[in-house]
């Protein structure tokens, strides 16, 4: 831990653990808080070593002081922790955090006199007085100077991003905080955002695009005069290739100033707006009020989504006035329309305050009861009925205003306003006509902005800042967007049905009226000129309305409705006007609860019930780069299989699933046939293994199967299956050619017929992913249109559950079947399950319960490994609902490397376990469905065989059960196993229910907390509450962390000879006692354990034991309670007897009293190699050069454990973990170069990409001349063919280009604002600075220390490929390249020779073969695809002149040419 372990020592640690986190709280400080604080200091550029002293803590408090009032919770916690550590160093006694802060405040005021008051972390501080503006560039004495952004501004920006999560508030917040900033300041703000790297990458891409556009629009001018300021490029505006001074000059120069800061701000705003849309995907058109949602909650969601919309204020104003009312639920909409034109938001909220509440429900119920209890009308007695008299003065029934005794009301008795009487009241008018412009006629869409219709508000009549034509165009564009949204996803009514095919093909241009069925489709119709609100009902045969008079030309008729039989009047040829369309139809009038237009009028109007869905388009699939399709020949098949395949292929060809392959198709895959389960039909299979190898990779979209315990309880369930699922989805045309296969014929009587797939083939690896993706798209509109219906789809199995009535549920299922059938998916009736029990995914489902389908365990006389594997699989499947299932001893039957067909010998324990499982399976178990409103609980139990079982339940109803028997270690601890059980249950619950259950665990709180304090880094554990159950898990023994004073100390050791397997184990004490035991057939680990057991046996109730074995220390520190090893069980029993025990580990033995003596005691005649004398030179080497582990191990022959310990004890090397060395794929001559800065000096760095070799030195100026000199110096030492740099001015200068041209070096540049393009040298800059920090004290000047650090990195760091240093690797690469070139030149001479040869005793000459290599005694010959080694005496080498030569022609044999033209 480096500096962290030395922050507090001895008594200070004890004092720390007594301080409470909060006054009066139970939790106290632990060492883990110190470790956390040390990690957090790095974020503020503070060293961890400052925590080791009082003065250092005071420096930290000084830095954190101004940040606390506006800081995050983490910052405040860090400040509090540092205050506590300061008090411990100052030996001040504190009880809690608040007391520590008060003490620190008092001391700092007394010592410095400047700390007037410590910041309070418990409440926010008031903002400081003064100007609050943010102006990084200020004019002082006529000159512009740059003032860096304050930490408070940066902290406000970070806090804004973290709290709002890129909500709509981030854009105006950025605009306010970045006002007047330069690109340097804006980049500083972006770099402060640590998380949200996806959003940062989006912003970087926008910056790159905008910078490229800027460069295109502003080309580079000609040569500039000396001293004149250059024009900014795109990378200059982004701040990557320009300085702050240049940015200020561009912004504030007298002639043609360029506001680079504002330009860069605009680029960032574009990126932020894109991020806002990504993080807030909800469209404003989709924000609708739920049936029971309060209006205030709906308004909050509406305005939150409105802020994320990036549009002009006029469109937002229209959205507010139109969509807010349009998307309200029917109850609120009715109230809002009564408020008149353009009500304020305050009026809307006030009016809709009680909607949906108990009061409104009571009023509606009273009105319904009043209508239901009203006396039935007497036939032909309408003339005798009298209208109820209502008083206009007091509003009561039973008397007129003349008879009213109440005081006379002033003003109008209708509206209450003065200035007119009730007869002239404008609100008494029917209001059918409007006195404002109607605008364009549009359809009555419940969700569309429309100036006419019963459910819309018109355009506001007050003047607008924009012309009316622009507002109308914006509204029309919004209408088109909304129409596309509705047509793409909602189930609705469309009328009229003209141009239906055009609409489904994707032409969204015509505005057919549509009605989303999220509420009742109600329109205003005119029956013989009389307005009436009617419901469009596709389930009604006739049309009936109430409240209108159509004369006496009618015929009486009795019709049956929802409320019983109704007496009506039937009128024929009545003129009806709906949606600006007139028809003549038959209509009835009568006492109906709601006015209905049935199918007779809907058909005449051309209306239809539609379910628009997206067209199933094939997904493009390609082969892997450089790969070609399969070309595998068809193997022979029996006549029976050929006939079956022929019949199957002809059927598939008729159905459009196959088509005949053209003769130019070169690809082929073997096909064969197997019998189906019923043994009567055949199934065609294609061996797509070769095609799968060359096809691109896919991702499984559905990662697991759904579980019935995660289903909500519903009254109706239906299960259906998609027949030939894969064959219903088209395969991309470009990929079909690779699926070609051939049907052979018997005796090759005729050419085989070749087919290719037009649909997804079975057995191809892309079919599951494409099918899952397509089904999600197909079912998405159905899910949106039926939010109350549960639709679970896994591959071709679909489950539909709802609480609807039987008729409505069956109608919904029918709609889904029609949807699937319309897209080409078949839903076979034999797999359609309407009544329980439903067979689904291996389960049996009932409306109120679920259980597993019948489980039959196999009965066999002879069991193989494969049989046992299948048996265990069946039992594990049953364990999800049958508690107590065990497979421990069954799994032990097949331990080790065994073949699948190998016979298994049963043990008594396994037979007993199987019989016990059979008894459990004979008792049927049932599971329940999930109820979200109830609490989810998990109860854990442990049986005698160390197997954990658990059940997840809600009250007494069990959802599912499970078991856990994984024991990863030989020596186990009950609390650790319990943590793994909790982890498994937590992950399982998150997957199935999306929430963590409340745990009932058999462990005491003290036991858990004692273990968790030491092992809290173990892994992810869900949050859980302790519930008291009988404790089964206990910690068996008490290990202390500090040596026990006054008790005997045992030094133990063991050793073993690997050849003879003989060993010794023993101990020696600080009081002179020792003991050695000779062991046979042992190992080093067993000898170490034996020595530890001897020390435990011979020690008293309290003891200190020192071991040098990490194996022993790991077992003891894990506090095992049981083990499979008899020796470890003996150690556990002895440790339980101890009152207290201290165990420590020390590396090696040298210089440690007692440990060195016992090592010599047990090593005589056993150990053969000692490396202790090399540890001190290795330590000196590391202190000097800070070499890594591999270098120390290689140079001094130390074990890696010892070398790693040397590195771990070095404070300078522990600020970062050990690097993972490697090598990128690069050419030999490729180098990267960059400039970095340290202590005010400029360091130019060049890195050889392939080896990691580094050249670096300090240069006086970052100019092109100095860079060119360094490049020339580098090129004179090493071979360079390619140099990669960034776009810095020194690297793009003419001097560098001239040197690169002269030396023949190809130069390339990185991408602006993307340092990953030169990632090797960027990383090496970081490593170089770390190395300099380690050896900084060994030299005075920066020039010297840079060269020393380069030497250490090139010659003292071993690792990567070949375990070589960078210098060795570079020299080896250059040498290898030269050898390859030499061998290539030598081998090129052999290309024009051919070899005839004889093999074995065969006297016939074979060949010719290609000569690959000629040695002194043999030659290497390539014949076809075979490579042969032939003795020289059996080979004849001739030169190939292109024509045929005789073998025996002596003029062409080896050695006969005078000019030496031989190999």
UniProtKB/Swiss-Prot annotation:
Domain called Integrase catalytic: residue spans: 1223-1374
Gene3D superfamilies: 1.10.10.200, 1.10.1200.30, 3.30.70.270, Acid Proteases, HIV Type 1 Reverse Transcriptase, subunit A, domain 1, Human Immunodeficiency Virus Type 1 Capsid Protein, Immunodeficiency lentiviruses, gag gene matrix protein p17, Integrase, C-terminal domain superfamily, retroviral
Stated regulation of activity: Protease: The viral protease is inhibited by many synthetic protease inhibitors (PIs), such as amprenavir, atazanavir, indinavir, loprinavir, nelfinavir, ritonavir and saquinavir. Use of protease inhibitors in tritherapy regimens permit more ambitious therapeutic strategies. Reverse transcriptase/ribonuclease H: RT can be inhibited either by nucleoside RT inhibitors (NRTIs) or by non nucleoside RT inhibitors (NNRTIs).
Catalytic activity: Endopeptidase for which the P1 residue is preferably hydrophobic; Endohydrolysis of RNA in RNA/DNA hybrids. Three different cleavage modes: 1. sequence-specific internal cleavage of RNA. Human immunodeficiency virus type 1 and Moloney murine leukemia virus enzymes prefer to cleave the RNA strand one nucleotide away from the RNA-DNA junction. 2. RNA 5'-end directed cleavage 13-19 nucleotides from the RNA end. 3. DNA 3'-end directed cleavage 15-20 nucleotides away from the primer terminus; 3'-end directed exonucleolytic cleavage of viral RNA-DNA hybrid; DNA(n) + a 2'-deoxyribonucleoside 5'-triphosphate = DNA(n+1) + diphosphate
Site (Cleavage): 135-136, 365-366, 382-383, 431-432, 445-446, 512-513, 611-612, 1050-1051, 1170-1171
Binding-site residues, Zn(2+): 1182, 1186, 1210, 1213
Region of interest (Interaction with Gp41), residue spans: 7-31
Ranges annotated as CCHC-type zinc finger: 389-406, 410-427
Site (Cis/trans isomerization of proline peptide bond): 222-223
Name listed for the protein in its UniProt record: Gag-Pol polyprotein
Gene: gag-pol
């Amino acid at each position: 831990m480096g500096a962290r372990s030395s922050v507090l020592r001895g008594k200070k640690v004890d004092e720390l653990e007594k301080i409470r986190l909060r006054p009066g709280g139970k939790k106290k400080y632990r060492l883990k808080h110190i470790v956390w604080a040390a990690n957090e200091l790095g974020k503020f550029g503070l060293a961890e070593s400052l925590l080791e002293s009082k003065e250092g803590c005071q420096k930290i408090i000084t830095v954190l002081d101004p940040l606390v009032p506006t800081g995050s919770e983490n910052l405040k916690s860090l400040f509090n922790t540092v205050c506590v550590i300061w008090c411990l160093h100052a030996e001040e006694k504190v009880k809690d955090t608040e007391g520590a802060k008060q003490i620190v405040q008092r001391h700092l005021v007394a010592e410095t006199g400047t700390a007037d008051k410590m910041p309070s972390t418990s409440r926010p501080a008031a903002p400081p007085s003064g100007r609050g503006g943010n102006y990084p560039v200020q004019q002082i004495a006529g000159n512009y100077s740059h003032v860096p952004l304050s930490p408070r501004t940066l902290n406000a920006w970070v806090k804004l991003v973290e709290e709002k999560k890129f909500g709509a508030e981030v854009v105006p917040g950025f605009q306010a905080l970045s006002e007047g900033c330069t690109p340097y300041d804006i980049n500083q703000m972006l770099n402060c955002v640590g998380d949200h790297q996806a959003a940062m990458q989006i912003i970087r891409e926008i910056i790159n695009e905008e910078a490229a556009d800027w460069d295109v629009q502003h080309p580079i001018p000609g040569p500039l005069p000396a001293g004149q300021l250059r024009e900014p490029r795109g990378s200059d505006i982004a701040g990557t290739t320009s300085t702050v001074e240049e940015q200020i000059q561009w912004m504030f120069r007298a002639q043609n100033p360029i506001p680079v800061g504002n330009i860069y701000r605009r680029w960032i705003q574009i990126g932020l707006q894109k991020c806002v849309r990504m993080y807030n995907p909800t469209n404003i058109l989709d924000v609708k009020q739920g049936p029971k949602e309060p209006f205030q909650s709906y308004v909050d969601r509406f305005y939150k989504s409105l802020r994320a919309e990036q549009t002009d204020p006029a469109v937002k104003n229209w959205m507010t006035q139109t969509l807010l009312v349009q998307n309200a639920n029917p109850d609120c909409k009715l109230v809002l329309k009564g408020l008149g034109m353009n009500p304020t938001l305050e009026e809307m909220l006030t009016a809709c305050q009680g909607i949906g509440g108990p009061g409104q429900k009571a009023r509606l119920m009273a009105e319904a009861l009043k209508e239901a209890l009203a006396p039935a009308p007497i036939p032909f007695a309408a003339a005798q009925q009298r209208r109820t008299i209502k008083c206009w003065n007091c509003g009561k029934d039973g008397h007129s205003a003349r008879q009213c005794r109440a005081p006379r009301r002033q003003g109008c008795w209708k509206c209450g306003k003065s200035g007119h009487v009730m007869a002239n009241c404008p609100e008494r008018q029917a209001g059918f006509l409007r006195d404002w412009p109607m605008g364009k006629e549009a359809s009555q869409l419940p969700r569309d902005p429309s100036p006419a219709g019963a459910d819309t508000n018109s355009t506001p009549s007050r003047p607008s800042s924009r012309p009316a034509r622009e507002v109308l165009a914006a509204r029309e564009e919004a209408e088109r967007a909304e129409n596309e949204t509705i047509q793409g996803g909602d189930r609705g009514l469309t009328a009229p049905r003209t141009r239906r095919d055009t609409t489904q093909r994707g032409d969204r241009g015509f505005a057919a009226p549509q009605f989303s069925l999220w509420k009742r489709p109600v329109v205003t119709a005119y029956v013989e000129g009389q307005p009436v609100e009617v419901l469009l009902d596709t389930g009604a045969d006739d049309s009936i309305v109430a409240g209108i008079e159509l004369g006496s030309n009618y015929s009486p008729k009795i019709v049956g409705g929802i409320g019983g039989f109704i007496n009506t009047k039937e009128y024929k040829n009545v003129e009806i006007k709906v949606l600006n369309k007139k028809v003549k139809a038959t209509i009835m009038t009568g006492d109906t609860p709601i006015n209905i237009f049935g199918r007779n009028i809907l058909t005449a109007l051309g209306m239809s019930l539609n379910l628009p869905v997206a067209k199933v388009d094939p997904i493009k699939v390609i082969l892997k780069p450089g790969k070609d399709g399969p070309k595998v020949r068809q193997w022979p098949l029996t006549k029976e299989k050929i006939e079956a395949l022929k019949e199957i292929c002809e059927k598939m060809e008729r159905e459009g699933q196959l088509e005949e392959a053209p003769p130019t198709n070169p690809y082929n895959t073997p096909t064969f046939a197997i019998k189906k389960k019923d043994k009567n039909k055949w199934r065609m299979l294609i061996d797509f293994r070769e095609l799968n190898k060359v096809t691109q990779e896919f991702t499984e979209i559905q990662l697991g199967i759904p579980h019935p315990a995660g289903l909500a309880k519903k009254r109706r369930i239906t299960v259906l299956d998609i027949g030939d699922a894969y064959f219903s989805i088209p395969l991309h045309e470009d990929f079909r050619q690779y699926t070609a296969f051939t049907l052979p014929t018997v005796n090759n009587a005729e050419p085989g017929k070749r087919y290719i797939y037009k649909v997804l083939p079975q057995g191809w690896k892309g079919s599951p992913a494409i099918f899952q993706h397509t089904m999600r798209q197909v079912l998405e509109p159905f899910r949106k249109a039926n939010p109350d219906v549960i639709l679970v789809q896994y591959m071709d199995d679909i489950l539909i559950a709802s609480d609807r009535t039987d008729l409505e549920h069956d109608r919904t299922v029918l709609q889904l079947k029609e949807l699937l059938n319309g897209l080409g998916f078949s839903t076979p009736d034999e797999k359609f399950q309407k009544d329980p029990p439903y067979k689904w995914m291996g389960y049996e489902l009932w409306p109120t319960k679920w259980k597993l389908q019948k489980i039959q365990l196999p009965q066999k006389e002879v069991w193989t490994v494969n049989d046992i594997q299948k048996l265990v699989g069946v039992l594990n499947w049953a364990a999800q609902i049958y508690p107590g299932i065990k497979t421990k001893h069954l799994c032990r039957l097949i331990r080790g490397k065994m073949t699948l067909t190998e016979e298994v010998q049963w043990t008594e324990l396994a037979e007993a376990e199987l019989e016990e499982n059979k008894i459990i399976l004979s008792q049927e178990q049932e599971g329940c469905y999930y109820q979200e409103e109830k609490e989810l609980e998990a109860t854990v139990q442990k049986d005698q065989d160390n197997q954990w079982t658990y059940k997840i339940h809600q009250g007494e109803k069990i959802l599912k059960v499970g078991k856990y028997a994984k024991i990863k270690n030989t020596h186990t601890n009950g609390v650790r196993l319990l943590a793994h059980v909790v982890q498994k249950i937590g992950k399982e619950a998150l997957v199935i229910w999306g929430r963590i259950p409340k745990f009932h665990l058999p462990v005491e709180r003290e036991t858990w907390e004692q273990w968790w304090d030491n092992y809290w880094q173990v892994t992810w554990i869900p949050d859980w509450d302790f519930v008291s159950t009988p404790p089964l898990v206990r910690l068996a023994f008490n290990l202390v962390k500090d040596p026990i004073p006054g008790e005997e100390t045992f030094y133990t050791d063991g050793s073993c000879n690997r050849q003879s397997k003989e060993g010794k184990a023993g101990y020696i004490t600080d009081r002179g006692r020792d003991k050695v035991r000779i062991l046979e057939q042992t190992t080093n680990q067993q000898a170490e354990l034996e020595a530890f057991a001897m020390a435990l046996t011979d020690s008293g109730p309290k003891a200190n034991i020192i071991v040098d074995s990490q194996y022993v220390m790991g077992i003891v520190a894990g506090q095992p309670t049981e083990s499979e090893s008899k020796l470890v069980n003996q150690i556990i029993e002895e440790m339980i007897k101890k009152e207290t025990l201290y165990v420590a580990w020390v590396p090696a033995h040298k210089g440690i009293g007692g440990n060195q003596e016992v090592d010599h005691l047990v090593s005589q005649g056993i150990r053969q190699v000692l490396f202790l004398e090399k540890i001190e030179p290795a330590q000196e080497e590391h202190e000097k050069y800070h070499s890594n582990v591999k270098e120390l191990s290689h140079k001094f022959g130390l074990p890696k454990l010892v070398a790693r310990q040397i590195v771990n004890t070095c404070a300078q090397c522990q600020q970062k973990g050990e690097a993972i060395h490697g090598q990128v794929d690069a050419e030999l001559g490729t180098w990267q170069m960059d400039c970095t800065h340290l202590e005010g000096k400029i360091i130019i760095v060049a890195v050889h990409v392939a080896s990691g070799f580094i050249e670096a030195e300090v240069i006086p100026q970052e100019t092109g001349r100095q860079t060119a000199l360094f490049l020339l110096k580098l090129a004179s030492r090493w071979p360079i063919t390619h140099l990669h740099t960034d776009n810095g001015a020194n690297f793009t200068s003419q001097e560098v280009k001239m040197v690169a041209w002269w030396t023949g070096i190809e130069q390339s540049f990185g991408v602006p604002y993307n340092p990953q393009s030169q990632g090797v040298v960027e990383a090496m800059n970081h490593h170089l600075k770390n190395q300099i920090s380690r050896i900084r004290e060994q030299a005075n000047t920066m020039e010297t220390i840079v060269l020393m650090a380069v030497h250490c990195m090139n010659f003292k760091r071993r690792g990567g490929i070949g375990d070589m240093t960078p210098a060795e690797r570079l020299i080896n690469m250059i040498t290898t390249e030269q050898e390859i070139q030499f061998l290539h030149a030598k081998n090129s001479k052999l290309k024009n020779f051919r070899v005839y040869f004889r093999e074995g005793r065969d006297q016939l000459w074979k060949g010719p073969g290609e000569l690959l290599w000629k040695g002194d005694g043999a030659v290497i010959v390539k014949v076809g695809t075979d490579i042969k080694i032939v003795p020289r005496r059996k080979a004849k080498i001739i030169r190939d002149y292109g024509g045929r030569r005789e073998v025996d022609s002596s003029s062409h044999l080896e050695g006969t040419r005078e000019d030496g033209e031989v190999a």
